[in-house]
């Protein structure tokens, strides 16, 4: 089923011909981690609206999150009729449209999904950013100085991940609630 409420909310957040204001208070990517916590029975400070699972259970023993970078709403619409998994989601579940954070780039969203912090709290805004402590342009996700092919050059320079990334972690927060979690990803990341 398609969540019509989400379509209407996101449509109302549009301005100009090309822009959508992030709906940080409800239908926004940044609310996915807290929604996962809530659905697993953990304390949650903010989450996506209950309408994202309208007609479905509001609590689960297990949740699988597939994070597919750059697979936005336009991609979903393009493949919805031809991809069996997307057809199954619509038939047996609920498809909701949500807004991206700003900026709508990979780096802030990767950090957000793992930390539970919206981009404004995480401080990671782009693939490359200037860090005043190092007085250098860095690539936070690769944890290196911009232009370097080598990984972890920031650590080699005495900079630690805690100096850059949020101290919060979705997985640590789930663990404090006695909820086991796993992340499967390429070891290169």
Residue ranges and their predicted role:
Residues 51, 71, 122-125:
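Short, low-complexity intrinsically disordered segments
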Residues 61-73, 113:
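Beta-strand elements within well-structured catalytic alpha/beta cores of enzymes
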Residues 59-62, 179:
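Short coil/turn segments at beta-strand junctions that form active-site/ligand-binding loops
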Residues 48-49, 69, 95-96:
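Short secondary-structure boundary micro-motifs
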Residues 58-59, 73-75, 82-83:
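ATP/Mg2+-dependent ligation/transfer catalytic cores
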Residues 48-60:
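A short acidic-Thr-Gly-centered motif at the start of a beta-strand
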Residues 1-45, 79-95, 99-189:
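His/Asp/Glu-rich, glycine-adjacent segments
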């Amino acid at each position: 089923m398609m969540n019509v409420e989400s379509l209407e909310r996101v449509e109302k957040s549009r301005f100009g011909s090309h822009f959508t204001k992030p709906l940080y208070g409800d239908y926004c990517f940044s609310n996915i981690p807290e929604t996962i916590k809530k659905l697993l029975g953990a304390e949650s400070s903010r989450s996506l609206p209950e309408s994202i699972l309208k007609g479905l259970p509001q609590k689960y023993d297990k949740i699988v999150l597939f994070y597919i970078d750059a697979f936005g709403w336009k991609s979903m619409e393009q493949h919805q009729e031809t991809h069996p998994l997307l057809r199954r989601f619509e038939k047996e579940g609920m498809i909701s449209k949500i807004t991206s954070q700003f900026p709508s780039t990979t780096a802030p969203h990767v950090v957000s999904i793992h930390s539970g912090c919206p981009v404004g709290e995480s401080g990671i805004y782009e693939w490359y950013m200037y860090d005043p402590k190092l007085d250098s342009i860095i690539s936070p996700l690769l944890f290196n100085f911009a232009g370097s092919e080598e990984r972890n050059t920031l650590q080699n320079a005495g900079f630690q991940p805690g100096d850059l990334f949020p101290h919060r972690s979705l997985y640590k927060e789930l663990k404090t609630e006695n909820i086991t979690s796993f992340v499967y990803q390429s070891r290169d990341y």
